[in-house]
Amino acid sequence: MRKFLLKPKKSLGQNFILSNEIIKRIVALAGSLKDFNVIEIGPGYGALTREILAYNPKFLLSIEKDSSLVKHHEQLLNEHQGKYRIIEADALNVVEKELVECPVKVIANLPYNISVALFLKWLNNIKFFTNLTLMFQKEVAERITAEPNSKDYGSLSVLSQLLCDIKKEFDIEPKEFFPRPKVYSSVITVKPLPTPRFAVNLETLTKLTRAVFAQRRKMLRNSLQSITSDVSTTLENAKLSGDERPESLTIEQFCLLANNIIMR
């Protein structure tokens, strides 16, 4: 990496993986890539990119916002003509289905500053993907995988687990990155479900969970007042007393609540 005179940009949440062993572990978790199109976010100088290409995917699309890094992929582009493309773009604004066809897998060391927003974007179109192997800050990974009655359980947990099977695979120490972040990172695997675990309007569920978890220490009868004018009927139809706090509700209970709420 020194030969490239690495100057990671904090504004873009750049932290490059130093360990080839970790890179190999990440790509291996995605399984066979032979018949799949693959999307990579923030390829940086191409360490993860090279390992993905070694698995001989049908096609690899890398999305890089930093124009100064795109030029470092010329050799890979020449070596894998017709099977590799890198575009300069903000991943939050990319419409993946316009660039690659199914089946699609995602493998990415996500930039810290857009990881949650990007994952939520993908959840809204989750059936497009076969699986996703993603690195987050450990704190974010724990929010995604959290169970009810835990401090990390929230809107992100509910939405993620409603739509996917998710597993936290392993943690990575700060020393394995350049520059060294202040926090641990975690790799998770995401397998979209054929259908959501429970029938629900996702927009309503999102608004509901965000509203009540913004007041997570309040009982539901109080936190629901911000989004519905008929709290009593909503609770009765959802078979809830109102004494519950948001963190105690299961995903099924949240879906039942969302299906019975009349939004303001």
Curated annotation (Swiss-Prot):
UniProt family annotation: Belongs to the class I-like SAM-binding methyltransferase superfamily. rRNA adenine N(6)-methyltransferase family. RsmA subfamily.
One of the record's GO molecular function terms: 16S rRNA (adenine(1518)-N(6)/adenine(1519)-N(6))-dimethyltransferase activity
Assigned keywords, A-Z: Cytoplasm, Methyltransferase, RNA-binding, rRNA processing, S-adenosyl-L-methionine, Transferase
EC number, as in UniProt: 2.1.1.182
Protein name: Ribosomal RNA small subunit methyltransferase A
Binding site for S-adenosyl-L-methionine: 15, 17, 42, 64, 90, 109
Pfam families in UniProt: RrnaAD
Segments passing through the bilayer: none
Xref: CDD domains: AdoMet_MTases
Cell compartments where the protein resides: Cytoplasm
Highest classification ranks of the organism: Bacteria, Pseudomonadati, Pseudomonadota, Alphaproteobacteria, Rickettsiales
EC main group: transferase
InterPro entries: KsgA/Erm (IPR001737), rRNA_Ade_diMease-like_C (IPR023165), rRNA_Ade_Mease_Trfase_CS (IPR020596), rRNA_Ade_methylase_Trfase_N (IPR020598), rRNA_adenine_dimethylase (IPR011530), SAM-dependent_MTases_sf (IPR029063)
Catalytic function, reaction form: adenosine(1518)/adenosine(1519) in 16S rRNA + 4 S-adenosyl-L-methionine = N(6)-dimethyladenosine(1518)/N(6)-dimethyladenosine(1519) in 16S rRNA + 4 S-adenosyl-L-homocysteine + 4 H(+)
Entry's Gene Ontology cellular component terms: cytosol
General function of this protein: Specifically dimethylates two adjacent adenosines (A1518 and A1519) in the loop of a conserved hairpin near the 3'-end of 16S rRNA in the 30S particle. May play a critical role in biogenesis of 30S subunits.
Biological source species: Wolbachia pipientis subsp. Culex pipiens (strain wPip)
